[in-house]
């Protein structure tokens, strides 16, 4: 069976990693859908889709996760309920299961006739991308403990944390 795991991954963190490891132990293949594919350089979406795919690949490689069974697929947001899943059906390989804890994603997937699998929440209070971006905005380096080391290094290399602070200064 092939599962779809949608997320924004802004940034990719250890909670995402735990879900992906769990999914790969359960399914033959995994499509990681990188949402908000055209959005970047904002407070909520500071990283490009390409940067996020690289983060995920680096994190999986660091933890020796075999990602030969993983397909990466960026998708643009759709503000019409259910349209994102129809777009995914048009452009991605066929899939059987949608994996999410997001109520809107769950509703859209069920309405489209898909099996929905709820992933375990791996310490969601700690591993939360909004919290990580907030720590970056505060120039609090403790966010480094919430992401794979390779992701931390990559974000530092592209100055992603500085970018986020620059965006915040220019938005107000």
From Swiss-Prot:
Pathway of action: Cofactor biosynthesis; NAD(+) biosynthesis; NAD(+) from nicotinamide D-ribonucleotide: step 1/1
Q: Kindly list the places in or outside the cell where this protein is found, as annotated in its UniProt entry.
A: Cytoplasm
| Entries under InterPro entries matching the protein | Cyt_trans-like, NMN_Atrans_arc, Rossmann-like_a/b/a_fold
What enzyme class is recorded for this protein? transferase
Q: What is its EC number?
A: 2.7.7.1
What molecular functions are annotated in GO for this chain?
ATP binding; nicotinamide-nucleotide adenylyltransferase activity
In the record, biological process GO terms are: NAD biosynthetic process
Q: Which UniProt keywords apply?
A: ATP-binding, Cytoplasm, NAD, Nucleotide-binding, Nucleotidyltransferase, Pyridine nucleotide biosynthesis, Transferase
CDD domains tied to this protein: NMNAT_Archaea (cd02166)
Q: Which domain of life is it from?
A: Archaea
Question: What catalytic activity does the UniProt entry give for this protein?
Answer: beta-nicotinamide D-ribonucleotide + ATP + H(+) = diphosphate + NAD(+)
For this record, an example GO cellular component is: cytoplasm
The family annotation for this protein states: Belongs to the archaeal NMN adenylyltransferase family.
Q: Which NCBIfam families match?
A: arch_NMN_Atrans, cyt_tran_rel, PRK01153.1
The molecule here is called Nicotinamide-nucleotide adenylyltransferase
Natural source organism: Sulfurisphaera tokodaii (strain DSM 16993 / JCM 10545 / NBRC 100140 / 7)
Q: What is the lineage of its organism?
A: Archaea, Thermoproteota, Thermoprotei, Sulfolobales, Sulfolobaceae
């Amino acid at each position: 069976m092939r599962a779809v795991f949608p997320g924004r991954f802004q940034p990719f963190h250890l909670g995402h990693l735990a879900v992906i490891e769990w999914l790969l132990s359960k399914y033959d293949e995994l499509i990681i859908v990188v949402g908000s594919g055209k959005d970047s350089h904002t407070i909520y979406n500071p990283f490009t889709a390409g940067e996020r795919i690289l983060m995920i690949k680096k994190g999986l490689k660091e933890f020796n996760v075999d990602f030969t069974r993983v397909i990466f697929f960026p998708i643009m947001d759709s503000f019409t309920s259910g349209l994102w899943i129809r777009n995914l059906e048009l452009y991605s390989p066929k899939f059987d299961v949608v994996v999410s804890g997001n109520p809107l994603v769950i509703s859209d997937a069920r309405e489209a006739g898909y099996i929905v699998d709820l992933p375990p929440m791996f310490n969601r209070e700690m591993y939360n991308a909004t919290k990580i971006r907030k720590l970056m905005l505060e120039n609090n380096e403790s966010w480094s403990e919430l992401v794979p080391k390779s992701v931390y290094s990559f974000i530092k290399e592209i100055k992603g944390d500085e970018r986020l602070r620059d965006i915040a200064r220019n938005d107000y």
